């Protein structure tokens, strides 16, 4: 059986892959999405959409869906000292080309909306891959996969690696990576904070030994994040709720919770891969290219920005384009990435 040909195949259907597919939905280009994942994205994560990116999401046609899914508005960021005294409030930047507030919504809901929009626009999405391989032939990429006891194959002119921090595409093609791991892990708690106003804010407390962030989650809940020493990890994982309340009250005077539970420990990492320099048309995006964890949704908003810029770079192509046509566009895109985005991610 002859493998179906696509203009673009994207390995990874998370935020980055979904965002690029949606950004391309009116381009006329055929897109294939492939992912090992069969369930939702990380349900423990909540993402905050920057005001400056909301016009982009409106142009993609997904803003109304995000609001219908329960996205809530957040005002600025409030800073407090170790005694709980207010230092300053950083307001939301105002301008004609940005939203009036941050929007926050669970990570998996944003991903589901992007994927549903992509599929409605004609993209082919295949999930639950148990195995896949990548080869080159006659100016194309060839992808073979196994999913649910069925095999499949496709060819594409351009390949996009959007398969996360531990990118398999990057590993298989031996693309260099610059990674920096930070000294202290980040502990995350989840709870329902008392006295939260209808106008949610991100609150940061500058305690004596650490910075504690109280991050709004949908439904009136709050995510608490702070660095911990490795020897303290056991405390946060095993101590009863009352102990968590007492410790947090020491760091954030005047803050109290109706409920508070341990969530997770995250090892902070910042990494950037080199652009692909080998044979064929390939580009890395999302965490496969630039990862910052945890980073208060900077990674997701950067995904949106990069997807929009890459889609704009490909706008001049028609379906059936050749490798010779797309390679100069990818070179221009990488140069723009280096000039505009690399300083933001440094």
Question: What are the language-model segments listed below?
Answer:
Residues 2-14:
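Beta1/beta-strand and adjacent pyrophosphate-binding region of the FAD-binding site
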Residues 2-5, 55-172, 180-188, 241:
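Conserved N-terminal helical subregion
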Residues 17-18:
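N-terminal Rossmann-fold NAD(P) dinucleotide-binding loop
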Residues 25-45:
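Glycine-rich FAD pyrophosphate-binding loop
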Residues 38-58:
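Conserved N-terminal glycine-rich FAD pyrophosphate-binding loop of Rossmann-like flavoproteins
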Residues 140-153, 158-268, 272-277:
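Conserved FAD-binding catalytic core of PHBH/FMO-like flavoproteins
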Residues 297, 312-346:
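C-terminal helical "tail/cap" subdomain of flavin- and related membrane-associated enzymes
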């Amino acid at each position: 059986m002859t493998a179906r040909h696509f203009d673009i195949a994207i390995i990874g259907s998370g935020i980055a892959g979904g965002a690029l597919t949606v950004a391309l939905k009116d381009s006329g280009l055929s897109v294939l999405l492939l992912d090992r994942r069969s369930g939702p994205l990380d349900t423990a994560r909540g993402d905050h959409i920057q005001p400056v990116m909301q016009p982009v999401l409106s142009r993609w046609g997904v803003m109304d869906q995000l609001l219908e899914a329960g996205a809530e508005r957040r005002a600025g960021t409030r800073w407090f000292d170790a005694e709980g005294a207010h230092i300053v409030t950083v307001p939301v930047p105002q301008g004609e080309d940005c939203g009036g507030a941050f929007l926050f919504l669970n990570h998996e809901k944003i991903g589901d909306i992007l994927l549903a929009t992509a599929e409605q626009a004609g993209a082919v999405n295949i999930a639950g891959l148990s195995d896949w391989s990548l080869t080159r032939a006659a100016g194309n990429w060839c992808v073979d996969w196994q999913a649910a006891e069925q095999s499949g194959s496709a060819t594409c002119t351009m390949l996009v690696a959007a398969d996360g921090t531990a990118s398999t595409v990057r590993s298989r093609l031996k693309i260099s990576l610059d990674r920096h791991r930070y000294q202290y892990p980040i502990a995350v708690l989840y709870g329902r904070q008392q006295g939260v106003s209808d106008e949610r804010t991100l609150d940061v407390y500058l305690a004596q030994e650490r910075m504690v962030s109280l991050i709004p989650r949908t439904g009136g809940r709050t995510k608490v994040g702070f660095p911990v020493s490795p020897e303290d990890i056991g405390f946060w994982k095993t101590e009863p709720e009352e102990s968590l309340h007492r410790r947090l009250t020491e760091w954030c005077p005047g803050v109290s919770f109706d409920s508070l539970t341990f969530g997770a420990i995250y090892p902070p990492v910042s990494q950037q891969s080199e652009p692909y320099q080998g044979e064929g048309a390939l580009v890395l995006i999302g965490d496969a290219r630039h990862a910052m964890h945890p980073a208060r949704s900077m990674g997701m908003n950067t995904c949106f920005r990069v997807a929009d810029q890459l889609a704009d770079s490909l706008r001049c192509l028609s379906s059936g384009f050749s490798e010779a046509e797309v390679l100069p566009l990818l070179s221009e895109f990488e140069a723009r990435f280096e000039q505009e985005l690399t300083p933001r991610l440094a």
